[in-house]
Amino acid sequence: MTITAGGIDLERVDYKGLAYYRHTAWDAVKHGVFTRHGGVSEAHWASLNVGGANGDDEQAVRVNHERMYEALDVNADDAVTVWLVHGVDTIVAHPPTEGQRWLAKADGIVTNQKDLPLVMRYADCVPLLAYDPVEEVIALGHAGWRGTVNGMGASLVQTMQEAYQCKPENIEVVIGPSISPENYQVGEEVVEAVHAYYGDASDLIMRDPEDGTAYFDLWSANKLDFERRGVRKTTVMGICTYENTQDFFSHRGEQGKTGRFGVVMSL
């Protein structure tokens, strides 16, 4: 099945019970935005939970990772990731040393190395997938509200520029499944942070006309962050995790009792 979002085609691929989305124009990149289907986890982690710090059985999570990598035909032993800390640091990836795939505390990873899969985990926060087809560089980021109001997207672009001489106009970005604007209620602390970083981009905050409750548009905010850094091709998939818990894990939609879905990119 293929869906069109922002002018690009996204294919939903089914593989041995797993289901994931891929950008049809990124044939040079093995990549997938995985749903929660096709794993072995049970209860509220059912079934392709790839988060290891939420109470799920460790062996089940390990099997889920292996199934995910098999679906993309990448080597599980080569995959690397980071400890997500809701910041804006981006690192340049290197192969795992002595089996240690957790490279650092960060929310962004960049590489131009082939056969070095990047993987991250999500459940409402925004997956940021970036690819420069000219310099053959990939990047993967994680943006909650803190990352969004402190420049996670900008951090990815800057690291791609500094490490690999990427030009922003050549970088293509996909903003993956995450909580939608109409479901992301926030407090005044977040509203102030949005205005501090984005200035007069008032359309990023929506107010309930009756009670004044604020809602934050993470999708448009991250897209704007990339655009301000010179990125011309940013596509929002437009899939809300909160409203689609049958396909994706959602921290808010499932009151914190949930797993994490995976995103993988590899050259």
PLM features: what roles do these ranges have?
Residues 1-267:
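Active-site microenvironment for binding and transforming phosphate-containing groups
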